[in-house]
Structure formats: C-alpha cells, structure tokens
Amino acid sequence: MENKPVALRLAIILVPAVLGAASLGWVSSSPAGSASFYLATAVAFLVWLIAWLGFGDRRCFSPRAGSTAARELGVGVGLGVVLLGIFLLGALVTRNILVLAEPVAGLMDNMRVDALWATVLTLVLNGVGEELFFRDVARRALDSLASPAASLGLQVALYVLVTVAMGVPLLLVGSLCIGLFTALLARRYGNILGATALHLSWSTGMAFLLPLFF
C-alpha cells in the first residue's frame, strides 16, 4: 500500500465504505425474507469482495509463520463465543427496553422466514466479506497512513460508522466490540483467519440465539 498515492489509499478505504453503508441501509429497510433483502445483502457482499479483489492481500488466509491455521481459528472462535455469551446476557436486560428491543426484533425476523438457509448464507458471506475489506484492505491502507495506535482506532471507527446505516442501536455496541477484537487479531497474526472465525462464530450464534430473547 505504501507505494500508492495517498489520495488513492483514501479512496480505497472510503469508496467501498460509503457503498457498503448504503447497501446495509438498503438491507435494514427491506422486509424480512424479501427478494429486496437478499438482493441488498448480495450487493453489500459484492462491494466488499470487489474492493478485496482490487486491493486485497491474496495471502490473508495464510497463518503467521510459526503459527498454525487451527490455532488462529481456535483463538477466533474462543473469543467469538465469549463475546456471544456477554451479548446474550445483555439481551436479558435490553429486551425490556422498547427503543432498543424493537429494531433488534425487526432484524431477527429474518431468522423466522421459510428460506432460513438463504438468510444464514448471506450472513456468512457478508461476515467474510466484511473481514476481507475492513480487516485486510482497510487495515493495510490505514496502517500505511497512520501510526499503529491511530490506525487501530480508525479501523474500529470506520466499522462502527458503516454499521450505523443498519439503524439498530445495539449493533453499534456489537460493531465496536467485534471491530476492536477482530482488528487486534488481524494485527497480531497479520491475516484474517482468527478475525473471520471470531466474526462468524459471534454473528451466527447471535442470529440463532437472539430470536429466543426478542
């Protein structure tokens, strides 16, 4: 990334982020299980994928030297399960707060449709797509533009700001936690194996278990 002009590096970060946010806004406004919902999620995935195909590291799923894929995936899954448990405990409280519970219940309606397999597939694809963009493309671009600490903060802030488009307040807390821990894993290992495992274990767990609360 360092050999690319600063303006291009900024565009690599901002253009997909804006397009992705617009797609997520479309997802949020689409009726549960509708063709519009699945089309919007497909568009969001394509935004992340195209950004990675253009500027991503093809070795981003290779384990760090001296480490193994199993170890890094295990760390990611372990952290994802811990965060899942914390969020489910939080759901016991937030389900009684109408302003917080209603948007979550609307989002969870997508897990109550006949084509559940399609919803889960889009969830997984977009989880992987977000990691390809935020924890590979955007991370490396920001690392080339800012100090390590500033880059980490900007990575998390970017992820939270894009998630705002979903219009679900509790997702902002989720994006803050997931954004921080996945960014730390990506920095530690220099790839997105652990980050993707964390993201998918948390998001799929939330998708199947949160409807029990809302």
Mark where each language-model region is.
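Transmembrane helix-loop-helix hairpins at the membrane interface
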Residues: 20, 114-214
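Structural signal for membrane-spanning alpha-helices in multi-pass inner-membrane proteins
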Residues: 20-25, 48-56, 83, 87, ...
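Membrane-interface helix-boundary motifs at transmembrane edges
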Residues: 30-33, 61-68, 143-146, 186
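Juxtamembrane helix-loop-helix connectors linking adjacent transmembrane helices
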Residues: 60-126
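Residue-level signature of transmembrane alpha-helical entry/exit and packing/kink sites
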Residues: 5-13, 37-41, 68-76, 114-119, ...
